[in-house]
């Protein structure tokens, strides 16, 4: 009954905050799913839907006990956590995937400033195959992941030194027993959450490059790279071709969606190599809306 009351309240108020979430599984009542769908259709974007059959195995794969995983909750907007026993450090960083791709295509040059920013591994005109481009993209991601992890380590150290949280520590399991503040590893679970941003843009860009440059060879690498460097100022027809003639992520085109999934999985596997200063692991999240405007402001033209 409470679930339906929450849905009714959201339908009446249509507030953007606090975020309302709905956990579902294969035996969720059809009536509940339909009620949630009607409320989502009112335009507030809520309730957010969380699939237990995807979330619970993902949590246990990261060392969360089955009991705690089944009792998961959502912190902040969409980040997953457990009840009363974790410091997940959600939003420790946001990683601009499409910026890493831009630097891969441009030889490490920031298209907005013209200054060196990333690793010079070649550029679009020097990668003879799509596989070479992918290898360079992976290497660019690796470089910035290392830089990001180093920065996060400093931030976490300074939080522990300058901003301990004794009240929070008093209500998080294991902190009292360990005699440690939650910022120093007192919690039962100590995670660091990093959000990957602009997966759809990466999939769309790589799909366009793969199809037009490497497979069909209807667009030369030189022409496309020039268009990216000049923001398509003298290439409106090429921009139209990229927008309308190449399949896009999220439209049930398997090979395009697989590009997005591939780089999500790669980024997640890359994060698994790191450990935070509290003895815990890194885990990945995905943001699909909130960070796209500020992230997009820091990216040049994309394919």
What spans do the regions from the language model cover?
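Conserved catalytic cores of very large enzyme subunits
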Residues: 1-303
């Amino acid at each position: 009954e409470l679930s339906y009351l929450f849905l009714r309240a959201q339908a009446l108020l249509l507030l953007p905050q606090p975020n309302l979430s709905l956990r579902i599984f294969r035996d969720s009542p059809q009536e509940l799913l339909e009620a949630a769908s009607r409320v989502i259709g009112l335009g507030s974007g809520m309730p957010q839907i969380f699939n237990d059959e995807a979330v619970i195995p993902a949590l246990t794969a990261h060392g969360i006990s089955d009991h705690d995983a089944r009792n998961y909750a959502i912190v902040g907007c969409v980040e997953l956590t457990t009840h009363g026993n974790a410091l997940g450090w959600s939003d420790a960083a946001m990683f601009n995937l499409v910026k890493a791709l831009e630097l891969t295509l441009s030889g490490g040059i920031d298209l907005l400033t013209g200054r060196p920013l990333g690793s010079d591994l070649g550029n679009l005109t020097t990668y003879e195959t799509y596989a070479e481009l992918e290898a360079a993209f992976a290497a660019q991601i690796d470089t910035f992941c290392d830089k990001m992890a180093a920065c996060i380590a400093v931030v976490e150290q300074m939080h522990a030194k300058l901003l301990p949280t004794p009240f929070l520590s008093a209500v998080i399991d294991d902190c009292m027993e360990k005699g440690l503040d939650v910022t120093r590893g007192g919690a039962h679970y100590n995670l660091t959450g990093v959000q990957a941003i602009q997966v759809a843009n990466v999939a769309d860009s790589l799909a366009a490059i793969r199809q037009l440059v490497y497979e069909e060879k209807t667009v030369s690498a030189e022409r496309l790279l020039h268009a990216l460097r000049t923001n398509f100022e003298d290439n409106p027809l090429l921009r139209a071709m990229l927008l309308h003639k190449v399949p896009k992520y999220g439209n049930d085109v398997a090979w395009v969606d697989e590009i997005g999934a591939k780089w999500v999985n790669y980024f997640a596997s890359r994060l698994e190599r790191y450990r935070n200063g509290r003895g815990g692991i890194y885990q990945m999240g995905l943001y699909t809306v909130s960070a796209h405007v500020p992230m997009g402001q820091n990216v040049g033209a994309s394919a």
